[in-house]
């Protein structure tokens, strides 16, 4: 009997694991919510309402303006697409706003070399009051999404109980697996449980989800960015070890290109999200985005760092009385990303330090490339003093890599 029990538990664990092999690096793409919310007024605002046309136009921009080629491949529908359920209980899109249906949209997106994401909610209703996915609908909805050739599912948690979430998220992971279609799974579960143990089991989440929202929704303001960043830093000892290839912490969307951030703050969010190994999911109007903001989001070295195959989430390693913070992320080939972040609100600050003060040791000579300016800083040893000038609410970001090991060269 004991052997049977062990075998049964092993089978259950195997079924529950989201064994899709996806998102070995953080996902990159575009998500509708932050910029376009639940705008369903297509009569008065046809260019900006949640509709088939909006997603097709964003897909065009992603394919034609360099986004896809830089790695931004997911085009994700959020709330307010659902029109109801048909007589057999299958979800249907709003017929007026998505007249050709989701399979048509998926085919269009795929024809451009992109992937389509969709939204559902573990509960009676979505957050905006559309039909949700109750426990008895989980398998059916997973099958529907697979038949529609969807590539990612974001499962929200409004209007559900802790018990329903505890059953529903693992059940959806198993149901997605059972479809045979690789569908990346974005879980909002921990955000509804306070984001921390013991109410959140991150070992389980890593088995059943490819990414998960831990904390509050981002809003279009610098205060919102800081509140999310500070929460992640406060709990980094818990959060940092659980992220890795195939399973990522998600501090929510990038605001860059919208209305609430200055240029310095936009550069800061991009750098900080990158050092946290966060998903890079834009939520802006790609039809009107400025060249300046495109440069931030399409920075090749930034994207290389974000997509580093080691998949190690970075940490804050220093917090100075001067309101300067330093973040570090280990990268492949013994390289590192360093972010010098100013929480000041007065004027540019001259920050003096050395690699030794930042816990780099050993007889190694480093070179650093400034991720935004492209400048190269050569001849850095652990005892070499350097100065970076950081603008208020801004960053200086380095890609730091070893060029010579003095001990090995002396042998």
Swiss-Prot record:
<feature type="binding site">
    <location>
        <position position="213"/>
    </location>
    <ligand>
        <name>substrate</name>
    </ligand>
</feature>
<keyword id="KW-0887">Epilepsy</keyword>
<feature type="signal peptide">
    <location>
        <begin position="1"/>
        <end position="17"/>
    </location>
</feature>
<dbReference type="InterPro" id="IPR000111">
    <property type="entry name" value="Glyco_hydro_27/36_CS"/>
</dbReference>
<dbReference type="GO" id="GO:0016020">
    <property type="term" value="C:membrane"/>
</dbReference>
<dbReference type="GO" id="GO:0008456">
    <property type="term" value="F:alpha-N-acetylgalactosaminidase activity"/>
</dbReference>
<keyword id="KW-0326">Glycosidase</keyword>
<dbReference type="InterPro" id="IPR002241">
    <property type="entry name" value="Glyco_hydro_27"/>
</dbReference>
<dbReference type="InterPro" id="IPR013785">
    <property type="entry name" value="Aldolase_TIM"/>
</dbReference>
<dbReference type="GO" id="GO:0004557">
    <property type="term" value="F:alpha-galactosidase activity"/>
</dbReference>
<feature type="binding site">
    <location>
        <position position="154"/>
    </location>
    <ligand>
        <name>substrate</name>
    </ligand>
</feature>
<keyword id="KW-0225">Disease variant</keyword>
<dbReference type="InterPro" id="IPR013780">
    <property type="entry name" value="Glyco_hydro_b"/>
</dbReference>
<feature type="active site" description="Nucleophile">
    <location>
        <position position="156"/>
    </location>
</feature>
<feature type="glycosylation site" description="N-linked (GlcNAc...) asparagine">
    <location>
        <position position="385"/>
    </location>
</feature>
<feature type="glycosylation site" description="N-linked (GlcNAc...) asparagine">
    <location>
        <position position="177"/>
    </location>
</feature>
<feature type="binding site">
    <location>
        <position position="188"/>
    </location>
    <ligand>
        <name>substrate</name>
    </ligand>
</feature>
<dbReference type="InterPro" id="IPR035373">
    <property type="entry name" value="Melibiase/NAGA_C"/>
</dbReference>
<keyword id="KW-1015">Disulfide bond</keyword>
<dbReference type="GO" id="GO:0016139">
    <property type="term" value="P:glycoside catabolic process"/>
</dbReference>
<feature type="disulfide bond">
    <location>
        <begin position="42"/>
        <end position="49"/>
    </location>
</feature>
<dbReference type="Pfam" id="PF16499">
    <property type="entry name" value="Melibiase_2"/>
</dbReference>
<keyword id="KW-0443">Lipid metabolism</keyword>
<keyword id="KW-0597">Phosphoprotein</keyword>
<feature type="glycosylation site" description="N-linked (GlcNAc...) asparagine">
    <location>
        <position position="359"/>
    </location>
</feature>
<keyword id="KW-0378">Hydrolase</keyword>
<dbReference type="GO" id="GO:0005764">
    <property type="term" value="C:lysosome"/>
</dbReference>
<feature type="binding site">
    <location>
        <position position="217"/>
    </location>
    <ligand>
        <name>substrate</name>
    </ligand>
</feature>
<keyword id="KW-0325">Glycoprotein</keyword>
<dbReference type="GO" id="GO:0016052">
    <property type="term" value="P:carbohydrate catabolic process"/>
</dbReference>
<comment type="subunit">
    <text>Homodimer.</text>
</comment>
<protein>
    <recommendedName>
        <fullName>Alpha-N-acetylgalactosaminidase</fullName>
        <ecNumber>3.2.1.49</ecNumber>
    </recommendedName>
</protein>
<feature type="disulfide bond">
    <location>
        <begin position="187"/>
        <end position="209"/>
    </location>
</feature>
<keyword id="KW-0732">Signal</keyword>
<dbReference type="GO" id="GO:0070062">
    <property type="term" value="C:extracellular exosome"/>
</dbReference>
<comment type="similarity">
    <text>Belongs to the glycosyl hydrolase 27 family.</text>
</comment>
<feature type="binding site">
    <location>
        <begin position="78"/>
        <end position="79"/>
    </location>
    <ligand>
        <name>substrate</name>
    </ligand>
</feature>
<dbReference type="GO" id="GO:0005737">
    <property type="term" value="C:cytoplasm"/>
</dbReference>
<feature type="modified residue" description="Phosphoserine">
    <location>
        <position position="322"/>
    </location>
</feature>
<feature type="disulfide bond">
    <location>
        <begin position="127"/>
        <end position="158"/>
    </location>
</feature>
<feature type="modified residue" description="Phosphoserine">
    <location>
        <position position="332"/>
    </location>
</feature>
<dbReference type="GO" id="GO:0042803">
    <property type="term" value="F:protein homodimerization activity"/>
</dbReference>
